[in-house]
Amino acid sequence: MSQRYTLVCGTNRRDAISLHVTEVYRTILSERGVTTNLLDLRKLPPDFAFSALYENYGKNEAFNPYVRLMLETDKYVFIVPEYNGSFPGALKTFIDGLEYPNTFRNKKGALVGLASSGHGASLALSHLTDIFNFCGMHILAYKPRLERIEESFKTGKLNSEKYHAMLVRQAELLINF
């Protein structure tokens, strides 16, 4: 049985570089014969924070397909931008709307950090790793941190061979993880 992969673009911000990086990663996996699902947080129902979480779990018919997708996934890749020293609140809210503990328990994940700063979202990746470990997910130790990301997308495409090589390395590690 083949494993199911889902790539999560970790922001709901329009025109975010995160989605471009997610597409690059998807291409890398595809070139290695891996079929993926792509989850773009911008496509979530705008009211899901109020209509799909906690006592409303399972009641939002527009959100439920995302819950099923995440439950049926074996391996995850989260492309995570740094916002205000951590990761986007939309991503945390999305995670809170998923079935606990079954969504992530004993599954595998990889994290990629993006930042305008020179830290490459180190704190964001640390915070998210703690959350996923709490949820029982095994996180790949190699976490590319793509700093000053805008400089590598001036042409609208990833123009950093170093960053591309980092993503390839992680993808190959994830396939064998």
Show where each model-derived region lies.
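N-terminal beta1-alpha1-beta2 submodule of the flavodoxin-like/Rossmannoid cofactor-binding fold
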Residues: 1-96, 100, 157-175
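Short glycine-rich loop/turn motifs that provide flexible caps or phosphate-binding loops at active sites
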Residues: 9, 88, 109-112, 119-120, ...
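Fold-independent oxyanion-binding glycine-rich loops
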Residues: 10, 41, 114-115, 149
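A short, flexible beta-alpha/helix-coil linker loop
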Residues: 12, 44, 111, 151-152
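Acidic pyrophosphate-coordinating catalytic loop
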Residues: 48, 117, 151-154
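Short, conserved loop/helix-junction motifs that constitute active-site signature segments
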Residues: 101-105
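Short, glycine-/small-residue-rich phosphate/pyrophosphate-handling segment
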Residues: 107-148, 162
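Short helix/strand-capping connector loops at secondary-structure junctions
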Residues: 145-157
